[in-house]
UniProtKB/Swiss-Prot annotation:
Annotated protein name in UniProt: Stress response protein NST1
UniProt biased composition (Basic residues): 16-25, 268-277
InterPro entries recorded: NST1
Cysteines paired by S-S bonds: none
A Pfam family per the record: NST1
The entry's keywords: Coiled coil, Cytoplasm, Stress response
GO cellular component terms, semicolon-separated: cytoplasm
Task of the protein: May act as a negative regulator of salt tolerance.
Ranges of compositional bias, category Polar residues: 1-12, 218-229, 1008-1020, 1173-1186, 1208-1219
Region (Disordered) residue spans: 1-66, 216-422, 503-522, 531-616, 651-693, 726-880, 978-1118, 1139-1275, 1307-1336
PANTHER family: MYOSIN HEAVY CHAIN, NON-MUSCLE
Organism: Cryptococcus neoformans var. neoformans serotype D (strain JEC21 / ATCC MYA-565) (Filobasidiella neoformans)
Low complexity bias spans: 26-45, 317-330, 368-388
Length: 1352
């Protein structure tokens, strides 16, 4: 945790926090035997006790300080006393369960073995080193772990690694001996992290084989206080660590007399205390190690760092009990072998002394080689100094490239110099360099500097991006630029010296050449010639060296300044760079003899950054390390070069800070003495160190520049050789081209000669050909002249023929036009005739319509008068007795009879007119058809006479039978004609019918089963048939009933079988002649409109309305196909309509009025008869009445109240059978062959009822009572010829038949009939072919009426 980036959490200043930490460390150094169990009598007395149990939890985030990913770990605020304190580590009694996984993709449990670590890692070797050092430093400070913000500031991958690497959180409890479980856990965690770091962080097999090998043994052995666990595994504390120089005097006095745990004397300033070697020896005496430990050997030489050999398994320490190898695989980096027992090894120096003092112990003969990752990342331990200068010792930074994360280091051969420059190459480079101009030299150096900067920037791309690192990058670039400028000046001066030496005026400059800083190295990696700045090498006397060392190292207080670090230095990233780039020194140069080292003594003090490249002197290993850096740069590996440049850039700021501290110390009273000591102890001045730094960079730059210039030289040589080759090729090409040109000239001469000969022969041939061509031309001209003459004659002949042909075409066109004109005139004449015909027809139609309108107006007025009278008659009927009712009935019958006579007369006159018009239109008909029509007319006249006689008899019978009926029933003729019956007792009316007359209720209602709210109406009807649907039959809707009407003795002016009475079929098809039949017609053929508004001219049938709306009088009166005679409304289309007709509930708009008929005596319906209400009708065409049903069994005129609302039921959908009145009323006997409507559909249809079969009341409901499907009775199919009129009354014998309609038919006499679902009195109904048959039917009807009256 950097002191600049993070302030103390308690709000204290840096110095106050430092004081607190030092006081806590002094308190912990006081011996407290009872706080820690003693496991051995050899435990030093100076070991401080374990901290109390209140130490924070081992996973407290404040205990860990891991840097983020990058090349430069975050600086740690070191505490000397806390770092070098050694405590007793309680060990677990069981097997060590810790095996560590760095694979963050796995969730490992405590004690699980690792199968392999192949996942990518985000933790570098530097992270683990910093974490271990931080843990060791903080273990003695119980208050240091209270900074919770620190744990949250750690990167996620560091926190995850700590959780994975410390599986002891739940396994250590308070039951463990001692009260320092947290401290013990922290020690174990630190040791595990160190072990993981030493094993390369990527090795899963055998990772825990050598981790704390004596952890399961009862007899525990610990390193000596001078060598901590971190130092045992190759770690040492920061070499430049120093205490604060501005601590107050009182604090320093309190620190006196307390020896440090590592055997060093208390670190005080020189001006406060001057102690010599005796005091230091006495203080270090009680901290002898409990057992001798072999010293860690130094790593391999720098030249072998990048390519470490395969690791050799080594035995473990003799004082520990290793675990069986069968249980755990061997470690790839085991501990070094123990030293021989007969030759005890002196105690190695501490990490501080290892970084500053010469090593007192010789390295083992066979040191184990580290992996490339460990050798490149781990700090050097106990580095032996070089003997180049007396009293000067230093360590070299490690320049090995770290191995890739997550991968095991591969076995590689020993490293050697990447490329060697022979003497010939050096001479060629020198000559080439001297031959370049000034601009070319500067360009070469600029290119080299740009390449180095580019590589350095690429290396920086993957490093940290914070502001501190950014400033560091800028400083490095500035330092590099300045160094290259200085090197260019050196190059220029060195080249000048070489040119002077080449002229023989001066000896050649020193150094290997050809550039300043060049070093010559042979193929084996040995430096054969140094650079031009290399100092003179000489041997030192061993005695003098020892004496100097003894004298220098006696004064321990001279180096007390190194124990206190300035906070400003600690808070910067530069303070740790020395550790980061330290490299272990190789064996001394071949020109020196390795001297035996004395026991560890203090080295002379060094300023910050002293243990770096700047103080290498003539060390051979350092020179080869620089060469290795250059070779790595040439291989695009700039890691080591980046470290070197960082130290060079840091050096400047370190010097500035040192100068600042020197200025602050000027006020001290012993400053002069201290300066004298430091000047005496400092082996090199700042200027010398700067010069050494320049020399170091010049060696690097020369190595790089040699390759650059050699490459340029080789390029130039290659270019020259290429140009020479091109020149030779060009010369060869020129010679070949000359030869080819000579040959071409000779060949051309030969060709020209041959060409001249050929030309002469060609001229002769052309002359001959020209003569022949002239002859051919003359012949062609003669032939063309003859051809032109022939063509002229042909053209003349063609013109003549074309003139003849054109004349013929003109004649044909004239004839065609004449023919077309005649056709057009004929067509015009026809159109004129047709137009006149249409005009005549239109005029007749208009006259007919005028007459019909006049007649309708008269009828409307008559209906109004009749309605008024009926209303008054109803009121009288309620009061009068049965006798008055009988009297009224007789009067009504007389009136109806007179009205029928008048109506027949009117109809006869109308029929005459219609027949005349039909005769005019049928002028072109065949004579045979006229004969047939005449025969049919004669036959119908005979039938009419018989019918009149029968009607007279039936009328008399009805009058006698009606006398016993108390209430008269209205004539059912109105049900088919749509007219309101006049009131009972009213006199015959001769006024014309009045349309839209309000309904007039009948004189009396049936006693039972009467349809509520309906009234019966009797009106005079025309003598032509009217459509009557069967009562109560829904499936036979819209089927007209053919009847003939007319009083006895009256005959129509024209026979009913004349063509004028031929009713139209669908789409205008006429009724074709058919054999006599009384059946109804079948439904219209497919594709025909069921609602065609067609009706025969002169037959008062209205056009058929669409089923979706209620017809109106205006539609019927002004329809283009409306009948000329008395208009008749549309037929009833369903059983619901039939029921409403029978019940008397009809509206003026539904049924067109006709002149009133004589009043017939009322008939009462049978008791118990089912009414014809809407609810009792069945079939698809049932129409529900919306009129409110009045109470049943209402008798008399009360059932026909004037206030009853009459609602015309609507048809819901078109019917599927018998939907259209394809036959006009009375068409059962009509002959239609000579009709103007054309031929119709000859398909027979089922008829209702057989002749003579009269079903009784309450027969089965299949067909309606009295209706059968056997052919021979009822209305015949449209288009079939009928010889005579037949009565339809014969086909209605039971319930559902409309007897009153029959009674008011062609016979002319008003018959009394029952309207409640059964047939009333007969009247003049039509017989099948004879009056006897019709008489039988009338008798049956009368018998049925009598039975019904008796039941009532």
């Amino acid at each position: 945790m950097s002191s600049k980036s993070q302030q103390p959490p308690t709000g204290l200043s840096k110095s106050a926090a430092k004081k607190r930490a030092k006081k806590a460390a002094k308190q912990s150094q006081n011996p407290q035997p009872q706080s820690a169990p003693q496991t051995s009598s050899q435990t030093p007395a100076s070991v401080p006790p374990l901290p109390p149990a209140s130490v924070p939890d081992p996973l407290d985030p404040a205990f860990f300080n891991f840097p983020g990913p990058g090349s430069y770990p975050i600086d740690v605020q070191y505490d000397d006393t806390a770092y070098y304190d050694q405590v007793d580590v309680p060990l677990n009694q069981g097997d060590f369960p810790g095996s560590y996984s760095i694979d963050y993709n796995l969730s490992l449990q405590n004690g699980s073995q690792l199968a392999g670590l192949s996942a990518p890692f985000n933790i570098t070797h530097d992270d683990l080193i910093s974490a271990a050092n931080e843990l060791y430093k903080r273990m003695a400070d119980p208050e240091f772990g209270s900074d919770d913000a620190y744990w949250s500031s750690l990167p996620p991958h560091i926190r995850q690694f700590i959780r994975d690497a410390v599986p002891f959180t739940g396994s250590i409890s308070q039951s463990t001996p001692g009260t320092t479980s947290s401290q013990r856990t922290m020690y174990q965690m630190a040791q595990q992290i160190v072990q993981a770091a030493s094993q390369g962080m990527g090795l899963g097999h055998g990772m825990s084989a050598n981790l704390m090998p004596g952890i399961n043994a009862n007899a525990r052995s610990f390193p000596s206080p001078q060598q901590t666990i971190g130092e045992e595994f190759g770690f040492h504390r920061h070499p430049d660590t120093r205490e604060e120089e501005y601590d107050d005097e009182e604090e320093i006095e309190e620190d006196q007399g307390h020896p440090a745990a590592n055997g060093d004397a208390p670190k005080k300033k020189n001006k406060k205390k001057k102690k010599k070697g005796a005091n230091a020896a006495s203080l270090s005496a009680p901290v002898e190690p409990p057992a001798p430990l072999p010293p860690l050997p130094p790593p391999s030489t720098l030249s072998k760092i990048p390519r470490a050999p395969a690791p050799v398994p080594q035995p473990q320490l003799p004082t520990h009990q290793p675990q069986p190898l069968s249980q755990q695989p061997p470690s790839l980096n085991p501990l070094p072998p123990p030293a021989p027992a007969s030759a005890p090894t002196p105690t190695p120096p501490s990490s501080r002394a290892a970084g500053k003092q010469p090593m007192g112990t010789n390295p083992p003969a066979n040191p184990p080689a580290r992996s490339a990752r460990a050798a490149g990342k781990a700090p050097a331990s106990a580095a032996p100094p070089h003997n180049a200068h007396a009293g000067h010792s230093h360590n070299h930074p490690s320049t090995a490239k770290p191995a890739p994360k997550g991968k095991s280091p591969a076995t590689a051969p020993p490293a050697k110099i990447w490329t060697q420059s022979s003497a010939e190459d050096r001479e060629n480079i020198r000559v080439f360099w001297l031959g370049l101009s000034e601009a070319e030299r500067r360009d070469l150096l600029r290119i080299e500097k740009d390449a180095v900067l580019k590589k350095m920037k690429e290396q920086h791309r993957h490093s940290c991006g914070c502001a501190v690192c950014g400033r560091k990058k800028v400083n490095i670039e500035m330092e590099l630029d300045q160094l290259y400028e200085q090197y260019y000046d050196e190059l220029r001066s060195y080249a000048a010296e070489q040119r002077v030496a080449a002229n023989g005026l001066r000896p050649p400059p020193s150094g290997a050449g050809p550039f300043p800083g060049s070093v010559e190295v042979d193929a084996s990696g040995t430096v054969t010639q140094y650079d031009h700045r290399a100092p003179e090498l000489h041997d030192h006397d061993p005695d003098d060296l020892d004496g100097e060392e003894s004298e220098e190292y006696d004064d321990d207080d001279d180096y007390a300044d190194d124990d206190e670090l300035d906070d400003d230095d600690i808070g910067t990233d530069e303070a740790d760079v020395g550790d980061e780039i330290d490299e272990p020194p190789p064996p001394p140069p071949i020109t020196h003899r390795q001297q035996p080292r004395r026991p560890p003594v203090k080295a002379p003090p060094r300023s910050e950054g002293g243990d770096d490249f700047l103080s290498f002197g003539s060390n051979l290993a350092t020179i080869k390390g620089i060469l290795t850096i250059a070779d790595d740069m040439l291989k695009n590996d700039g890691t080591k070069f980046l470290e070197m440049m960082e130290q060079l850039a840091i050096r400047r700021s370190v010097r500035e800070e040192q100068n600042l501290r020197d200025m602050q110390e000027e006020t001290d009273e012993e400053e002069e003495e201290e300066d004298d000591d430091e000047s005496r102890d400092e082996p090199m001045t700042e200027k010398e160190r700067a010069e050494e730094g320049k020399r170091m960079f010049q060696i690097f730059a020369a190595r790089m520049f040699e390759q650059r210039v050699l490459q340029a030289y080789r390029e130039r040589v290659a270019k020259q050789r290429e140009e020479q080759l091109l020149r030779e090729l060009e010369e060869e090409e020129d010679s070949k081209r000359a030869k080819e040109e000579k040959k071409a000239k000779e060949a051309q001469k030969k060709k020209d000669k041959k060409k001249a000969q050929k030309q002469k022969a060609e001229e002769e041939r052309l002359a001959r050909e020209a003569a022949l061509e002239e002859e051919k031309r003359q012949a062609k001209l003669r032939k063309e002249e003859a051809e032109r003459e022939r063509m002229r004659r042909q053209d003349e002949e063609r013109v003549r023929r074309e003139a003849v042909k054109r004349a013929a075409q003109e004649e044909a066109q004239r004839q065609a036009l004449e023919r077309k004109r005649r056709q057009q005139e004929e067509k015009e004449r026809e159109e004129e005739a047709a137009k006149k015909k249409r005009e005549r027809e239109e005029k007749a139609k208009k006259e007919r319509e005028a007459r019909e309108n006049e007649l309708k107006e008269k009828e409307r007025k008559e209906r109004e008068i009749k309605a008024a009278k009926e209303k008054a008659e109803k009121e009288r009927i309620a009061k009068e007795t049965l006798e008055k009712a009988e009297r009224d009935r007789l009067a009504k019958e007389a009136k109806e009879k007179a009205e029928k006579i008048r109506q027949e007369r009117l109809e006869a006159s109308r029929m005459e007119k219609v027949r005349k018009e039909e005769a005019a239109r049928k002028e072109r008909e065949a004579v045979e058809q006229a004969k047939i029509i005449a025969a049919q007319q004669a036959q119908r006249e005979r039938a009419a006479k018989a019918e009149k006689n029968t009607a007279d008899k039936a009328a008399a019978e009805r009058i006698s039978a009606a006398r016993v009926i108390p209430v008269a029933a209205t004539a059912p003729v109105l049900a088919t004609l749509g007219l309101k019956s006049p009131s009972k007792g009213s006199t015959p009316q001769s006024a014309p019918p009045v349309p839209q007359l309000s309904p007039v209720k009948g004189a009396a209602r049936p006693i039972t089963n009467a349809t509520p709210g309906r009234s019966m109406q009797k009106t005079p009807t025309a003598y032509y048939p009217q459509p009557v649907p069967p009562v109560g039959v829904a499936s036979f809707s819209r089927m007209p009933l053919a009847q003939s009407f007319g009083p006895p003795g009256l005959r129509p002016a024209y026979p009913t079988g004349s063509p004028a009475y031929s009713p139209p079929r669908a789409n205008g098809s006429s009724i074709s002649p058919n054999p006599p039949s009384r059946g109804f017609t079948d439904p219209s053929p497919p594709g025909f409109d069921h609602n065609l508004r067609t009706a025969p001219i002169g037959v008062g049938f209205p056009p058929v309305k669409p089923s979706g709306r209620i017809p109106s009088m205006a539609d019927d009166a002004f329809s283009p196909t409306a009948p000329i005679g008395v208009p008749v409304t549309r037929s009833v289309s369903s059983a619901g309509e039939m029921g409403s007709l029978i019940s008397g509930s009809v509206t003026p708009d539904d049924y067109r009025p006709t002149p009133p008929a004589p009043i017939a005596p009322p008939n009462l319906g049978p008791i118990g008869r089912p009414s014809f209400s809407d609810g009792q009708t069945s079939g698809p065409n049932v129409l529900r009445s919306t009129s409110p049903p009045p109470p049943d069994r209402v008798l008399g005129s009360a059932a026909l109240g004037a206030d009853d609302e009459i609602v015309q039921p609507q048809q819901r959908r078109p019917t599927t059978s018998w939907d259209m009145p394809t036959a006009a009323p009375g068409s059962g006997r009509w002959s239609a062959s000579p009709s103007i409507w054309g031929s119709g559909d000859p398909t027979p249809a089922p008829s209702w009822g057989a002749p003579g079969s009269m079903p009784t009341v309450a027969e089965r409901p299949g067909p309606p009572p009295g209706l059968s499907l056997s052919p021979g009775a009822g209305v015949n199919v449209l288009g079939q010829r009928q010889p005579s009129f037949g009565g339809i009354g014969s086909s209605f014998g039971g319930v559902g038949a409309v007897g009153s309609v029959i009674g008011g038919g062609m016979g002319g006499t008003a018959g009394s009939g029952l309207v409640q679902g059964h047939v009333g009195g007969g009247g003049y109904s039509q017989g099948l072919f004879s009056p006897q048959h019709q008489q039988q039917q009338q008798l049956q009807l009368q018998l049925q009426l009598q039975q019904q009256q008796q039941q009532q």
